[in-house]
Amino acid sequence: WYGVPFHYVSSESKHVSEEQIIEKTQSTDILIMARYMQILSSDFLSTYNRPVINIHHSFLPSFTGAKPYHQAFSRGVKLIGATAHYATEALDEGPIIIQKVSPVTHRDNINDLKQLGTHLEKQCLLDAIRAVSEHRVIIHDNKTIVF
């Protein structure tokens, strides 16, 4: 993947998954969670000592958890979004690094939202990785300053 090391970790068992993450990422600078759909334990986060970025397929704090496109569609949103944030032990609650949005209309169906959202997720994650790896993010309380 463009020369970037990639490791797949199953999310079947949280304890086993977290052990695999530690084993496979000993030399990494940043851990990226994409479609992991699990909350990392506070023990893991306190010992990992490196940035952990999660990409969520909604404009947080709206539509946390699973199936945000379905939630957004059922609410008739006018904007669809993606959020890259630091992972915490609380679901989709970490400090937000980057967000991207795009307008949608009543003509868009769930598949349209997913397609547009996937594009936003890629842009959002790339910008977040770039900002974090270039040390351009400062965390203060549960907020970030990105410069």
Regions found by a protein language model. Give the residues of each.
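One-carbon transfer enzymes
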Residues: 1-147
